[in-house]
Amino acid sequence: MKIHILPIEIINKIAAGEILEKPANAVKELVENAIDAGSTSIKVELEEVGRNLIRVTDNGVGISREDLPLAIEKHATSKLNTKDLYDISYLGFRGEALHSIAITSEMKIASCFNGEGYVIDAQTKEVKPHHIKCGTLVEVRKLFHNIPNKLRFLRSEKTELSSIIELLNRLALVNPNIAFELISNGRQVFDYQTATQLKRMEQLKVLGKEFVENMIHVKHTNDGIFGELFLGLPTLTQKRNNCLIFVNGRPVKDSVISSVMRHAYNDYIPKNTYPIAVIFIRVHNNEVDVNIHPNKSEVKFRDPQVIRRFLLSVSSRSLLQCGRSTSTTVADRAVEQFNQLLKKQTAFRKETVSKTTESGFFQSPKAKKAIDQSQEYAKQFEGKRNLDFDQMQNNNGPFHFSTDQSEEALPLMSHKKTSEDYSNKLPLEKQQSPSIFLHDNRDTSFLQQQLRKINHCEHLQNEKHFETFGKFKCQVHGTFIITETENEMIIIDQHAAHERILYEQMKKSITSPGQNLLTAEFVPLSEKAVEILSFNVEKLKEIGLVVERVSHCAVMVNSLPEAFKNVPTNELIEDIASLLEEEIEPKTLLERIHANIACKRAIKANHNLTREEIEELLTLMEDIPHTGQCNHGRPTHIRLPRKEIEKLFLRS
């Protein structure tokens, strides 16, 4: 087969195919042109997700009549000259986009410059006067009509529209000073008005409402780098590495920044999850190369280590400040689960009452009289339930409170009440009438109420109040600790909290040198484990662990780090051999070992604690950083606002 030169038409279509893979690419190029033109308002209209129509309208500076024919020529641009190649400040610069779109569609461009409007047909190159009064309007019809192969590879309308929405959201996110509107098949998808950066994030909900409510916002400048970071709390994670990254106003994918952010969160989130973050970086244009990808979606930093150090420093310090914070999504999920449970219980009660009514239980005259009387008492009681004990004593109303002392039981008692506990509390005839409606023994009841009030006050004087976690109230199921503040109830997972405390305490000893053992310890292992340890002898020495191979299935341990002195050596060495299979750095290895030890040594569920032990745990949670999540990224506590609890009981 002879070599021949391709026709220019085929060459152009091949080149256009590299730039335009799908409708979203065409939308991207047109919207970026509008941004570069200084627009403050951009409107995108679609029909059949761009296959039939893409119309982009802006209020930018416009294109003059003389420049309109040049705008659709290949490599024609107003944004770049020879000496600017390494100082690119615009989103578009190659002069390829409009030419590629013109080749693959039927395109018209109308623009107003200095009060004069003109339109050009990209196919005929004819320029005519136009009524446009401001900015530029680009209309693209029948995209890919002359490249059938492209049409065949387009995905469903829903998928293609999602790509366009994601693209526009990212451009809107980094340009909050520009209003964006998207209309698809005559339906408005979104309309974002100009806003501050934070307000724009709330408008977009790109990462969800939860992210906006559970993030750390930090700005920092150093070494010619400006960074604005929105970092999700450690308990807010995702399964994909999908941080939103913007460099010099350009949405990009960058492996350096992504890896830095994962490393910054390494100490706080589970192994196979990723942080949620939005990163804005600005550097001098000659410090970053944006001309390495056809769609300009990747960049290359001149000195990536400088960027790495900057981001790692800023994000690490910011995460330190979040301390005991845990995301509100945890509480939201809890309230949602409570609501679901409440619906089920309410449905069950309605069904039970319905069946009881049908059985004729409430049909007897005595039953009806009792119900009427109860309702009358309830009306009198309503509005008086906030009275104190003295007011109640002087009131002539037909009620007083029960003197049942069961609710004053010690908080740490875990005795499970049975039906016998309740049935034996009162004689049968007393059980048949609610204590709230009793009329007799008023004086005795009042005396008992006052005694309870005095005892309760003495008990309150002994209660310890914690700044963050309020007052300790009780332990539930030997697993959860309940505290309360003025406006919240807090549920603490004692194992998760203690695990994090132990881990943070052990981290302080990371730099401690290894200690020689008085007697070297012989540890039998599998052949594979011995091979792994032998291969990593030098790495282990860096963390103060000295091991020596003595056979194909055993090692001798001569020195251990201080933090491991109370850990069974054979168990420790087995864990280390397992971790070393991942080829991790010494510092990360030590952190993983500490995390494993902390998990094993922390107090377990179903373990009753004394008040003193619980108060000590709460004190440590207040004093030690990062107690908002355990070593695996799970929350150590959730906060249920009082208002949400009241809603569960329909008190709102």
Swiss-Prot record:
Keywords assigned by UniProt, alphabetized: DNA damage, DNA repair
PROSITE patterns: DNA_MISMATCH_REPAIR_1
GO molecular function: ATP binding; ATP hydrolysis activity; ATP-dependent DNA damage sensor activity; mismatched DNA binding
Organism domain of life: Bacteria
InterPro entries: DNA_mismatch_repair_CS, DNA_mismatch_repair_MutL, DNA_mismatch_S5_2-like, HATPase_C_sf, MutL/Mlh/PMS, MutL/Mlh/Pms-like, MutL_C, MutL_C_dimsub
Swiss-Prot/TrEMBL GO biological process terms: mismatch repair
Xref: Pfam families: DNA_mis_repair, HATPase_c_3, MutL_C
A Gene Ontology term for the protein's cellular component: mismatch repair complex
Keyword flag Coiled coil: no
Record carries keyword DNA repair: yes
NCBIfam families: mutl (TIGR00585)
Family listed: Belongs to the DNA mismatch repair MutL/HexB family.
Task performed by this protein: This protein is involved in the repair of mismatches in DNA. It is required for dam-dependent methyl-directed DNA mismatch repair. May act as a 'molecular matchmaker', a protein that promotes the formation of a stable complex between two or more DNA-binding proteins in an ATP-dependent manner without itself being part of a final effector complex.
Name of protein: DNA mismatch repair protein MutL
